[in-house]
């Protein structure tokens, strides 16, 4: 199997210069040494020339850089993305805890061990696989989680509120997907998603009543969360598509794209909406807005549209955002 040969720092600088990137050499040396050529290549790929005959669905860029590309701007894009990941991860953490709490409240309303009962969940939910994954997390947590160890020694079983503390967002999202549709709608409404089903066509209504759209959005946010947790590139990431038909009937979410959303703007808008319900007065939307203004808009060769942002993005992200109290 052939692989690309490794290159020295001097060779990397020469490659970038020959392909048309303007170099601040001391800065470039520092970044290539600290961050690596390969990691940065994911950011300067967006600065490579896109041929006129490129496939719009799977465009392949040329090696040559767009005129005006500088290492300084690529480093600025990297820094913006790093700050964006930090902010997004913070927001998703709050959403994860809130979703876990609401799902847990529904599950334990009659029995603390109801999560073990497959009849509680919708047809098609792989309860056995989900429960096996949860038990695996419990076993791994015994050595470090005092509550898990206590319940293992004293009772031999675990109420959901104890189990919940070892679940990650993907576990909770999958569990939410497994709930009956009426439970999903109830939890979704708790987050402020008051869908006007009367504005949906018959096919869209059926889809909405079969499964709440928040399920797919949580799936998308799980992907976003994992991107952030693994320090991967976020700003122009294509995500698991989430339907927008039902949520676009909510005035504060009307700027979502038609049909479905697979770019970052939709995820950020839904996050801002949920966080205003979870933490009234949250400054998260304004922090996001400020970051875009201070760090992204100074990048002369990048466009906010790459992340799926519409013209009215600022008003939409900050809708009903009155308080500046930090939380």
Model-based region annotation:
Residues 1-327:
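Long, contiguous internal "core" modules enriched in hydrophobic/ aromatic residues
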């Amino acid at each position: 199997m052939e692989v690309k040969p490794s290159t020295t720092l001097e060779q990397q600088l020469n490659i970038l210069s020959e392909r048309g990137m303007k170099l601040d050499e001391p800065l470039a040396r520092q970044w290539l040494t600290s961050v690596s050529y390969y990691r940065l290549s994911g950011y300067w790929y967006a600065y490579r020339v896109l041929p006129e005959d490129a496939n719009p669905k799977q465009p392949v860029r040329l090696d040559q850089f767009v005129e005006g590309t500088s290492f300084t701007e690529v480093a600025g894009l990297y820094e913006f993305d790093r700050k964006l990941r930090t902010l997004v991860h913070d927001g998703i953490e709050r959403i994860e805890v809130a979703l876990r709490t609401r799902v847990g409240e529904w599950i334990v309303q009659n029995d603390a061990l109801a999560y073990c009962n497959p009849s509680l969940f919708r047809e098609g939910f792989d309860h056995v696989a989900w429960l096996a994954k949860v038990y695996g997390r419990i076993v791994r947590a015994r050595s470090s989680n005092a509550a898990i160890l206590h319940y293992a020694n004293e009772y031999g079983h675990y109420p959901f509120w104890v189990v919940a503390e070892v679940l990650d967002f993907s576990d909770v999202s999958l569990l939410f997907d497994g709930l009956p549709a009426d439970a999903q709608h109830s939890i979704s409404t708790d987050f402020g998603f008051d869908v006007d089903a009367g504005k949906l066509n018959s096919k869209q209504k059926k889809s909405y009543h079969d499964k709440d759209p928040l399920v797919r959005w949580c799936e998308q946010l799980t992907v976003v969360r994992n991107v952030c947790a693994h320090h991967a590139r976020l700003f122009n990431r294509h995500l698991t598509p989430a339907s927008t038909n039902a949520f676009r009937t909510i005035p504060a979410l009307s700027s979502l794209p038609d049909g479905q959303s697979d770019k970052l703007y939709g995820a950020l808008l839904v996050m801002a909406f949920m966080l205003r319900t979870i933490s009234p007065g949250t400054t998260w939307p304004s922090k996001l807005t400020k970051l875009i203004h201070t760090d992204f808009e100074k990048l002369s060769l990048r466009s906010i549209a790459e992340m799926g942002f519409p013209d009215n993005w600022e008003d939409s992200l900050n809708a009903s955002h009155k308080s500046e109290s930090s939380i």
